């Protein structure tokens, strides 16, 4: 088997989809309740207070209503309404993907490998996907078997095969809505009651009809956990699975 360095980008894509072993906690709005927090601790195998974290705000820069600006600072500093960085980590740093191509790999790869959890903010999933590829972070996924990826909205959607046209904002060079495909289902976050901010069930059903694959709609009290290909839903709220 050829090493990743000798493969084309397309070949590397299929390799890391097949080999990715990072543990996933895919949320709509962060660690919003006790059930999701308990699932996180279970994935870590130790208390949050004994765990190191790196937050990834990159997705925010691609979304016109989120960043750059105050939103990124609120996320990093733990002042947002979506609990991620303020959970009481042993250590917390920032991993800015747009900066990584301009610095030596030795400056950041060992740091990522030694970190317990990666916290990916919401924002634009296609922008985040682009920079996960450009930075080389996605190529590390097969070696991060002990690492937990906690996604928030776009930070969760980036792990899916595609996000659907309804969620396309920033457009990648490919022009399509495909994302990393680490999992085999798509996600519609922010499921909400009719008339409330977010995506209604009717809107989620219409979105799912255009996905042409398995999908989940999850509200802000729900997360999807994926470990070694096994998927389960942790929820104190509302969610729905759409078969392919």
Language-model segment annotations:
Residues 120-196:
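Class I SAM-dependent methyltransferase SAM-binding "motif I" and its flanking Rossmann-like core
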Residues 2-7:
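Extreme N-terminal basic, low-complexity initiation segments
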